[in-house]
């Protein structure tokens, strides 16, 4: 599963940079240090030039079981309770204009079940052009948007204004990328993925 998670991380990174989320979103893998110590696999740069909106998002990608996913969400809860956000120690921006640490970035999880991850990994390895329109693109965006909403509301209840504002701002940007509000029908559709379903249960119970 660890090997599959790594292949999925590489595949998702490649697809996002090939235009999965449009021209305004790019991702970069983190350093080995930040992967191991800070549990962050990718940094997403969302840069909507037309409206002067820019944000960095720390992404952890997991092909995992419910118990492990719960630990990821608990870590985010712990950061929010302390009104903290994620930190990446070693980072270079996509355009090369920035090198250094990134502080106070929202942490989110991308969850895909083992069966689905295997299909994506195989399609990526074979350079299957159908991957450009794979439903996982939409599933990931819904996961990220729903987490932003849940973590912002949780931060409100914890009195963590900085965290709440950061997650709300990120949700606003992700909704612009997605292009519409997320419907219950879409959530039900992607609920066939066991990890997507478990993620929904966890964030709805915060």
Where do the PLM segments sit?
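Extended aliphatic helical segments
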Residues: 7-12, 25, 36, 57, ...
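Catalytic cores of nucleic-acid endonucleases
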Residues: 56-59, 63-130
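Residue-identity detector for glutamine
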Residues: 15, 51, 67, 77, ...
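Generic structural signal for short, flexible, solvent-exposed coil/loop and linker residues
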Residues: 31, 50, 97-99, 140
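Generic ordered-secondary-structure signal
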Residues: 8-16, 29, 37, 44, ...
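Catalytic centers of nucleases
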Residues: 4-69
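Active-site or metal-binding loop neighborhoods of secreted/extracellular toxin and effector enzymes
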Residues: 99-206
